[in-house]
Amino acid sequence: MFKRLVFVLMLIGTGFSNIANAALELVITDGIDSARPIAIVPFKWEGATKLPEDVSAVIASDLQRSGKFSPVPTSKMPQTPYSEEQVNFGKWTSMGVDSLLTGTITQNAEGSYVISYQLVDIVRGQLTQGQSKALSQDGQLVLSKDHVLFNKVATVPASRMREYAHRIADLVYEELTGERGAFLTRIAYVVVNDKDPYPYQLRIADYDGYNERLVLRSKQPLMSPAWSPDGQTLAYVSFQNGQAEIYMMNIYSGKREKLTSFPRHNGAPRFSPDGKTLALVLSKTGNLQVYTMDLATRRLTEVTSGRSNNTEPFWHPDGKSLIFTSDRGGKPQIYQVNLSGGETKRLTWQGSQNLGGQITPDGKFLVMVNRSDSGFNLAKQDLETGAMQILTKTLLDESPSIAPNGGMVIYSSIYNKANVLSMVSIDGRFKARLPATNGRVRAPAWSPFL
């Protein structure tokens, strides 16, 4: 029974779906009222032609989508300063804004764009009115401008304007939260378009759905994309030869390599944190079992054994253990196995089933699909205390994938009878949805930092 359930879940998780040519668009659905107000002032541009990207709009959208910030709409801004010297601290303080990003864009002789930008601490500026002073190296009393959190300049080609906007959002996010931003990342997913001669498609896009690119198309199912730690390779499952086989593909060169083609099932590939080993699931000896493969030698090591079905391996961030889903207790639950000694322990006890587990990059939390009376929902479990929190109220949640900074989780769910990708913050307070038009998009895999 569990074997059939695993196969069904794998099919659900692959993303048998289609999407419109337009980019996926994130829509905040919950938690915006408690987000932190911030001002992303439109960057000054006096060129004769239109900019290739609205940099400030991309930054504002990124920060809003994190769920932690609520950018002030341009129409409600009391002023639009283009440098920190023009900021009226009192006007922004009265709106509850404590941070402001401002900047200018010019074009150089080579056609590239010079972006100058500053992040301003409004609270500090209000206290000092921008007149805080400090001793210089030669003993002179000079303006310290300690209300300016950072002041940066970059020269960017037109083709990379949107990419650099994500970079600025990362810098703002890290400065204000102390955590690394994950806006300059990608997602991989599987799409199906029944009207296409090659209906099964593996695609990648920026985390927000822009710059979507077709990586691979096939007449047979594609499943379970997984990123290498360097962000250059995807492992995935293909049925192009009539059975499940595991492949590895460089997303830049397109070079593909078959890794396994054992009888019956080959699936659920997952790179180790150092990229040297692949965890995978094979059924060549009967039931589904977890293995590891040394990618240099192709040597296989069996990790689990016995009469139970064991699947969905995921590496602990330290690379010393794996978590996996097993029916050894009767119903699917999540276990952890030490790779050096083989000791195995059960991690999940709440809910009739727990599947698709992933561990946050800091090793503190387990995120999984929990089945209870309310259905299949994402849940988070504290690995030290065992305390569990239901993160979502969406329908038929599956395939969670954690952002590399651990701040958000992307997953598949049902909305208005359609399959969509959704996001939830790791604390469950903020939720967003990536609606798909005329189809379904599933099996997201969030890339590492790029």
UniProtKB/Swiss-Prot annotation:
<comment type="similarity">
    <text>Belongs to the TolB family.</text>
</comment>
<keyword id="KW-0131">Cell cycle</keyword>
<dbReference type="InterPro" id="IPR011042">
    <property type="entry name" value="6-blade_b-propeller_TolB-like"/>
</dbReference>
<dbReference type="GO" id="GO:0051301">
    <property type="term" value="P:cell division"/>
</dbReference>
<dbReference type="Pfam" id="PF04052">
    <property type="entry name" value="TolB_N"/>
</dbReference>
<comment type="subunit">
    <text>The Tol-Pal system is composed of five core proteins: the inner membrane proteins TolA, TolQ and TolR, the periplasmic protein TolB and the outer membrane protein Pal. They form a network linking the inner and outer membranes and the peptidoglycan layer.</text>
</comment>
<keyword id="KW-0574">Periplasm</keyword>
<protein>
    <recommendedName>
        <fullName>Tol-Pal system protein TolB</fullName>
    </recommendedName>
</protein>
<dbReference type="InterPro" id="IPR014167">
    <property type="entry name" value="Tol-Pal_TolB"/>
</dbReference>
<comment type="function">
    <text>Part of the Tol-Pal system, which plays a role in outer membrane invagination during cell division and is important for maintaining outer membrane integrity.</text>
</comment>
<keyword id="KW-0132">Cell division</keyword>
<dbReference type="InterPro" id="IPR011659">
    <property type="entry name" value="PD40"/>
</dbReference>
<dbReference type="GO" id="GO:0017038">
    <property type="term" value="P:protein import"/>
</dbReference>
<dbReference type="Pfam" id="PF07676">
    <property type="entry name" value="PD40"/>
</dbReference>
<dbReference type="GO" id="GO:0042597">
    <property type="term" value="C:periplasmic space"/>
</dbReference>
<keyword id="KW-0732">Signal</keyword>
<feature type="signal peptide">
    <location>
        <begin position="1"/>
        <end position="22"/>
    </location>
</feature>
<dbReference type="InterPro" id="IPR007195">
    <property type="entry name" value="TolB_N"/>
</dbReference>
